[in-house]
Each structure stands twice: as C-alpha cells, then as structure tokens.
Amino acid sequence: MNIQPIEKRRNSDGSQLEVHSVFNTIQGEGPFCGTPAVFIRLAGCNLQCPGCDTDYTTNRWNSTPFTLLQFVQEMRQAPSLVVITGGEPFRQNIHPLVELLLAEGYTVQIETNGTLPPPTIGFAEMCSLDTNERNRCFVVCSPKTGRVNPAIASLVCAYKYVMAHDSVLEEDGLPLRALGHTASPYVARPPKDFHRPVYLQPMDAYDPATNEANLKACIRSCMKHGYILQLQIHKIINME
C-alpha cells in the first residue's frame, strides 16, 4: 500500500527542482519502449495511488536544470532519450529543464498522470505528437483519475494503461481503475478523436496466476479494440 503523501503543485521559476533520482536504463514502456534512456525521477506527486510501487519521496535533493544536464551527459555521451518521470513531473516547473535538454540535442519524454496543466504557456511549442521526430518533447499520459486536464490532453502523443483482469469496462476494454485510485465513473479515456497509440499493459500482481489472468485480459482487449499490447520490459530484464 502506497503511503507516500500527496504534495501540491510547486510554484517556482524552474531554477530549482526537487529530484528523487537520476539513472541510466532501458525505457520499458510507451512509444520509446526498448530505447536506452536516462531517467530523471522528480520527487513528489499530487496523487496517492494505493497500488503505486515506485518510491518518489525518500532521499530527495534539490538541483538546477544545468546540474541535471551534466548528470545526463555523463551517463549518455551521444544525444538520445531523456525521460522525466516521478511522482508527477508537472507538479514542478520543468520548462527550463526541458528547454535545456532540447537545446543540447536530446529527445525528451514526459510521463504524466494528466491531472495538472503544463507549467507555462509556451511549453506546448516544445512538444510534438509525432514520435518519429527527434529532439522534441513528447507527453505520454497514464490517467489515474476520471479526467485529463484539457491543456495536457492537447499535447498527449500516447496513452498507456496498466490493467487488472477484474477491473475492465467491457464496452471499450479499458480499465475501470488505475493503481487502485478512485475515479468517477472510471479512469479517463482518450478523446473520441484520438488516433494515436493506446498501450495496454498487464498489471504485475507479483502472483503468477493473477499475472496470467491480467495478461489474458489485456490480450482480449487489444484483439477486440485495436490497442497495443505492451509488457513492461524493464521488469523482464531486471532494470529500474
């Protein structure tokens, strides 16, 4: 059970960010699945999902965007993928960090729960919906509540859902809940006119029988509704 506290949006100019960790890994999900990446995990989240198994609060430290860039450069010499995750990245003003990373030639992916708007009016200018592009910012949304903030929805290049076999709406094959968080009437769906990727991932219940049921439920939904089945490969290859 996740007991990490809910933290409100942090108003700042983005010159200082609360960071949990920076690490080199393989992106295990979403449109860049399988791509070597540096993850910047920011501290704190505006939600408290009971089923979340990610630590995003302990041992936090403050950093400037430039210091984070230096960490990235030490880990990935050639310009490549940087994933900003959390917690919830949009809880903080990440505009200066994203701008700096793009200026240095990196491609940036942001993983968000979709509840908070972008930190600045000009943030959208750095974003793209076409994941074939590089050296742009891409927003991937994994909804946890019943609504996605409209300002974020317009920037989302892909949606992803983690699904349990006993929490599926048969009408559209998507989850009723995400990580046990309350949602009314159920977790937010992509807009009706959304024609970009929607990924379904079986929830890891740490139980073989339940995991098999979760996988079969995802397969059924993908076959029926055309979603993309995706396994969390970072868990399969034992990377963070």
Regions found by a protein language model. Name each.
Residues 31-34, 153:
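Short glycine/proline-enriched turns and hinge-like loops at secondary-structure junctions
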